[in-house]
Every structure is written in C-alpha cells, then in structure tokens.
C-alpha cells in the first residue's frame, strides 16, 4: 500500500507536484520532501506541510550559479519540456513538418513560432529545426538573438529603446506597457501565419504574460497548434486551461 510506505518514509522525492492531502496525513513528522514546488504560487499548500512539521526543500529556488549547476532541476525539466512540446505539436498537427518533394508535388515545411528563448525555448527551437520546420523565435532579452540564430531560427526584434530592462539575465522580467503593446503587435503579425506556436515565457513569482491573444488565434490557419508551457503560471495564451486540450473553431 502506497500510504503505508509513505508512513515509513524519511525522505520523499517529487518532481513537480506537492504531495496530496492523503500523503501528507499519512506521513510522519520531520519527513523531508525534496522537489520543485513553485513556492510563489503554492504558498497555502506549502503551509499545510509546515503545519504537519514536514521539511520542504524546493529546488526551484536554487541560485543558477556554476556551483549549483549539477542540481539545476529547473533547467533539466525545462529542457525536456521544450523537446516534448514539439513532439506533442507534431502529433496534433495534421501535416508533415519537413519539406517533402515527391512525384505528386512539393509539400512546404511547417512554420513554427517559439515564444521565449530560455532553456525550454532553445530546446524547442533545436527540436523543431531537426524535424524540418521553418522556425522563428521571440524573447524580451535581446542578448539571446545570437543563441536563437545559432540554432538556425529567425529572431523577432521589438524596439525596446524605452524599456528599463537592459541587463543580462537568465530570467525574463516585467516590461513597460509601451513595450508590451509593441510586442503584442509584432507577435500578432508573425503568429497568424504560423502552423505551430510553442510558448514558454514565464516571470518568477508573477503571472505569465499573455502573448497570444484571442484575435490572433481567430486569424490563425485551420489546423494550427499551440502548445503553452506556461500553463502552471496562468499561460501565455488567452483562454487556455492548464492541462487541457482545447479545440477552437475559427
């Protein structure tokens, strides 16, 4: 029985989810739980663990420095998420990804837009390119343009002369309202012609920014696929529901 095993456990490892109520009630005091629990968003759930006198080590708060690199679970999970997002999109997409030249004619390659060029985004770019897509990417950090282009993708530029965010960072940060308007216009212009959109943009401790609006979705081609990896933080796509597949008749 799972609960009997939990009752005898001293250290419990979890990947992405906080142990449910039954597990918490079955565990003994001073249990050590290690995993990624997003404490910014799950404060109440973590308080219930503290009430039970359970010790929680949330590895997503580890500093992203070289000494802690071997324990950087965020990067390893994001890497897998970026890869899986493209594979999932290819399964849902009704056509082939690469260009195919046959006796019956030529099939043009699928167009893929990656929003957010962090660890997940860069892996999504690399995977989509390997599968034969024409890839375009966007990120609020202009310094990642070189990384995006090194993977063979195009980079969408937004004039950020009025932005207060200039320094190098591994995380995206809050932008000015004026920048957000320019950003949405650029993304809308590119996204409506795409076959695949994968969104990965998140801001630590805050709700994920809406990058793909309803009007953009309505103008996209029939059969297009959006995979939103920011669902746990509210999503980058307007109207999305975390963990659910939604079919929109546009």
Regions found by a protein language model. Name each.
Residues 10, 16-17, 37-38, 202-203, ...:
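Short glycine-/small-residue-rich Rossmann-like dinucleotide-binding loops
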